[in-house]
Amino acid sequence: MSLTRLNIEAFRNIQSAQLIPAPGINLIYGQNGSGKTSILEAIYFLGMGRSFRSHLSQRVINNDDDKLTLFATLNLARGDSKIGLRRFRSGETEVRIDGEKVKRLSTLAETLPIQVITPESFSLLFEGPKSRRQFIDWGAFHADPQFYGAWTNVRRVLKQRNQLLRNGSAYSNIQFWDQEFVRYAEQVTEIRNHYVDSLNELLKGIIGEFLPSVDVKVSFTRGWDSKTDFAELLENQYSRDLATGHTVSGPHKADLRLRVGTLPAQDALSRGQLKLLVCALRIAQGKLLKQQIDKHSIYLVDDLPSELDAQHRQLLLKQLTDTGAQVFVTAIDPAAIVDSLHTPPSRMFHVEQGRVTVIE
């Protein structure tokens, strides 16, 4: 899978741009503030319906416009597919895939799987369990069609249960919701656990390439003691949950733990090593997606030279090339990327003040 055409209208400082990306490595270079990262952000927005740089989607709309428009043609195994998205300043979003209106943003994510490696993505190991759950759930969502529905139900039931707790409801009023919660929680946990097991098989070899002298152990924690019956736990913890006003244990507390010996990876490794570990996780996740559903991710790699030294840039770019996936990578100096590749980039784009030029 690859993008063969990308149109961007009124997205940050890009008033209008048309790109014809190539399979393989697409290098986008330009000075800071030129708009090169905005191209990556636009691709991400098209696949996720949101930005990876701002929680307020209205901020990505060009100041002179009331809406942004993104359009792409995807080359898929079954033929070409067209995706269009409009986001209005009012917050309304309009999405079409092959001319048909789409109501769920999850359909975008399913159509256009995206992996991001940016300076911010290295916070995967520092920001707490939420970002690591999102990492697991990205893979579980793509790997198992049952996951999205089960996780949606977990969130729905959890919201209802927490509301009852805040209202001080007796356990007899919560018991029905606990039966639902247990059913969906166990389904979500089984899918997550299976996904992490599959990821681990690939990850060992990739971590060995990036960090050959480090033994990293990766494990999944479900959000409650696996030796404890979840239904019994919820009943036994009712008083505690009532006191806090929320559900203390459950799949919403799951985590991906990475350890070196007895220490968490973030305490045992240097900042440079942690960056390589996150790169290994992203590479493994993309490779597993290809194995499981025969679909490539699209990789967005921002400001690579500032994050990794020349040796590790070369290693990451080799790993990305070996996946066979389409890659968009940005840099201020194109030589920092070109010199790290065994073959020239498939295509190069120069960005200046929001204007994009293809370099022949």
UniProtKB/Swiss-Prot annotation:
Localization per Swiss-Prot or TrEMBL: Cytoplasm
InterPro entries from the entry? DNA-binding_RecF, DNA-binding_RecF_CS, P-loop_NTPase, RecF/RecN/SMC_N, RecF_2
Q: Tell me if Cytoplasm is a UniProt keyword of this record.
A: yes
Which UniProt keywords are listed?
ATP-binding, Cytoplasm, DNA damage, DNA repair, DNA replication, DNA-binding, Nucleotide-binding, SOS response
Which branch of life, at top level? Answer: Bacteria
Q: Where does ATP bind?
A: G30, Q31, N32, G33, S34, G35, K36, T37
Molecular function terms in GO for this entry?
ATP binding; single-stranded DNA binding
Identify the Gene3D superfamilies for this entry.
Answer: P-loop containing nucleotide triphosphate hydrolases, RecF/RecN/SMC, N-terminal domain
tRNA-binding recorded as keyword: no
Give Gene Ontology CC terms. cytoplasm
Instruction: Give the GO biological process terms.
Output: DNA replication; DNA synthesis involved in DNA repair; double-strand break repair; SOS response
**Major location, coarse class?**
cytoplasm
The record's annotation in HAMAP family points to: RecF (MF_00365)
Question: What does the function comment of this entry state?
Answer: The RecF protein is involved in DNA metabolism; it is required for DNA replication and normal SOS inducibility. RecF binds preferentially to single-stranded, linear DNA. It also seems to bind ATP.
Family statement drawn from the similarity comment of this UniProt entry:
Belongs to the RecF family.
Q: What is the name of the protein in this document?
A: DNA replication and repair protein RecF
Q: Which source organism does the UniProt entry give?
A: Shewanella baltica (strain OS155 / ATCC BAA-1091)
